[in-house]
Amino acid sequence: MNTKELIASELSSIIDSLDQEAILKLLETPKNSEMGDIAFPAFSLAKVERKAPQMIAAELAEKMNSQAFEKVVATGPYVNFFLDKSAISAQVLQAVTTEKEHYADQNIGKQENVVIDMSSPNIAKPFSIGHLRSTVIGDSLSHIFQKIGYQTVKVNHLGDWGKQFGMLIVAYKKWGDEEAVKAHPIDELLKLYVRINAEAENDPSLDEEAREWFRKLENGDEEALALWQWFRDESLVEFNRLYNELKVEFDSYNGEAFYNDKMDAVVDILSEKGLLLESEGAQVVNLEKYGIEHPALIKKSDGATLYITRDLAAALYRKNEYQFAKSIYVVGQEQSAHFKQLKAVLQEMGYDWSDDITHVPFGLVTKEGKKLSTRKGNVILLEPTIAEAVSRAKVQIEAKNPELENKDQVAHAVGVGAIKFYDLKTDRTNGYDFDLEAMVSFEGETGPYVQYAYARIQSILRKADFKPETSGNYSLNDTESWEIIKLIQDFPRIINRAADNFEPSIIAKFAISLAQSFNKYYAHTRILDESPERDSRLALSYATAVVLKEALRLLGVEAPEKM
């Protein structure tokens, strides 16, 4: 129980008209620490109690009695709580030194499954920065949900089916060079894809030819299938190399093609339930009662199925396979209408578990304010970007610590971590402009800044040869220490907020605040000097390092011991 929960609990025992949850939402942190650590505004009670808020605040302050508070005073309409810094710091440091990286572990999920649909790049196209967001947000959410007691299933729903394969087959047959593709598969396939899209703008017959080849693919044509399988295999080799660089793993690579033989069953269920309507030769599901104007297009007039049919099949398969408590789709916000339709159709089919499905949208990555597009060849490829980030990180590490032994390994952790952290610190629904120089900077709100704060603490602990004692009597009551203690104590609540909002940026911003608070503490406090507080200061440094490393881990970012 953190201090806000303690205060809410104490207040709820003497306030009849508000429960603990309602009180918790009303608690504030005063801007001026001289007004206390936490404040409760009494305005909301005035109507019920038929008293002035000032009088209510005074009465509540008088009734409060807990060893956790140094004092409780009424200031106008507010009840201001001054916490016992020594007692709380002792409690927090004891918890972290005992639990170490398991500090803030929770069992909210009771080991139920969370399925995370994430990354999902398109086969035969290079892995670009555009795919990064879904990959790193999904990976971070997996760590966050595991931290609070869920098991996670990470699904890479590969874009390995669709008309684009018709386009690619046509392009390869017209202009492809087998040896060139074998030597540099993704580069060559991208050139072919960009070329056919450019030429199709002036030659509509190419579109028709592509549609015909895709129909052949759907009908099991031997040549079409062989080319498709080749494109898929070559792409997966490249993708897996990049996933290894990012240290991201998956539990399933079942992509769009996996559901080819599962869509007829969906159409049959919809038909049996009388949900399919005829519209201009196509089959649709009307969703007007859900406030959705456009019906869900299940089957086109030529008999071809659509994304939603495939996603319905995937949803049914995943529920049956994993019995999920939550199923989340980390997909760009431009797909919001699609996921509203998906949930509504599942509801129409009578599946209550459609409520457990959540679309987790995110904003676009731009370059100099311009939208990126693989089709137009305006793209930032991830592999050379990682190489450049690692190179920039290494230059800075060599300048700061030329004697460092494992420079290449550390530079890789810092370079990759910088790209991930910059993405994850951005509020998910906002986009950001890609700026590698800003990402890899050791100054400002960046991954390297947080990693460097962690490495600095490890250096202090090595110099002191500090090993925390679980029975250690650590406590501090100075202002700089208190700022850090409050943050560490808040870590479990921060994790819960990140999970509730599917928002890793809450963790990233917390990590920045904790690193900044420690750096300020380090600048004002002689941690290693002999003094009665030395062990407690070292315990605080240790606890900060534990929580920083764990916060970075929840973001999928490594924390090097030396930098």
From Swiss-Prot:
List the Gene3D superfamilies: Arginyl tRNA synthetase N-terminal domain, HUPs, Isoleucyl-tRNA Synthetase, Domain 1
**Gene Ontology MF terms:** arginine-tRNA ligase activity; ATP binding
Give an example GO biological process. arginyl-tRNA aminoacylation
EC numbers listed for it are: 6.1.1.19
The protein's UniProt keywords, in alphabetical order, are: Aminoacyl-tRNA synthetase, ATP-binding, Cytoplasm, Ligase, Nucleotide-binding, Protein biosynthesis
Return the motif ranges for 'HIGH' region. 121-131
Q: Pfam families per the record?
A: Arg_tRNA_synt_N (PF03485), DALR_1 (PF05746), tRNA-synt_1d (PF00750)
One cellular-component annotation, GO: cytoplasm
Where in the cell does this protein reside?
Answer: Cytoplasm
Catalytic reaction(s) noted:
tRNA(Arg) + L-arginine + ATP = L-arginyl-tRNA(Arg) + AMP + diphosphate
Q: Could you confirm whether the keyword Ribosomal protein appears in this record?
A: no
Repeat as a keyword of this entry, yes or no, is: no
State where it is primarily located.
cytoplasm
Q: Which InterPro entries does the annotation name?
A: Arg-tRNA-ligase, Arg-tRNA-synth_N, Arg-tRNA-synth_N_sf, ArgRS_core, DALR_anticod-bd, Rossmann-like_a/b/a_fold, tRNAsynth_Ia_anticodon-bd
Would you identify the family this protein belongs to, as annotated?
Belongs to the class-I aminoacyl-tRNA synthetase family.
Its assembly, as annotated, is: Monomer.
**HAMAP family on file:** Arg_tRNA_synth
Protein name as catalogued: Arginine--tRNA ligase
Q: Which organism is it from?
A: Streptococcus pneumoniae (strain CGSP14)
Lineage, broadest ranks? Bacteria, Bacillati, Bacillota, Bacilli, Lactobacillales
